Regions:
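Intrinsically disordered, low-complexity terminal/linker regions enriched in Pro/Ser/Gly
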Residues: 145-161
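Surface-exposed, hydrophilic segments of mature proteins
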Residues: 23-29, 108-114, 147
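Short beta-strand and beta-hairpin "edge-sheet" elements
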Residues: 100-143
Length: 161
């Protein structure tokens, strides 16, 4: 009797792709987040309300939301459109855009589960060689699917009933 199913596959971080819209005030122009970045993960920062009733020995917890953010340290590469967009916002307040998360390990026929979120970008440090920034996800994401052709994603929101 096998304890591990035979169809288990190891996911790679390159299969969880993130794109930033570098033209947020017009038609989306998605650029990959990844050039010059060796490590990045989305922190969910869950909000949990805890309450312990006097008649119980253990507390109750209510997961009320997430405060997602992506903290990035990126080596600077001239002509990388995503870096150029981040760099242009170094001294700007409320520098907003959109972020697209695509799970390419879960797709069928070139269509992948995806989430699009509004976001706020803040630069925390810049040395010329590296730039550090945080992308704060705003509100609930729009669920949908994405296809990727020539490195450019096309997002299609899921229609709700």
């Amino acid at each position: 009797m096998a304890l591990i199913p035979s169809d288990i596959e190891k996911n790679k971080r390159s299969q969880y792709q993130k794109f930033l819209d570098i033209t947020p005030s017009s038609t989306a122009s998605w650029k990959v987040i990844g050039i010059g970045i060796s490590e990045a993960s989305v922190d969910y920062n869950p909000s949990v309300d805890t309450e312990q009733w006097i008649i119980e020995d253990s507390a109750r917890n209510d997961h009320t939301g997430n405060q997602k953010q992506l903290s990035v340290t990126q080596r600077c590469y001239k002509n990388d459109p995503e870096f150029e967009f981040i760099n242009a916002g170094r001294d700007k307040l409320n520098y907003v855009s959109h972020i697209l998360e695509i799970d390419t390990w879960n797709g069928n026929n070139g269509s992948y589960p995806a989430k699009k979120s509004d976001c706020l970008v803040t630069v925390t440090s810049y040395s010329g060689e590296e730039i550090e920034y945080t992308i704060y996800f705003n509100g609930d994401p729009t669920e949908g699917t994405a296809s990727i052709a020539d490195g450019v994603p096309t997002f299609t929101p899921t229609t709700s009933l």
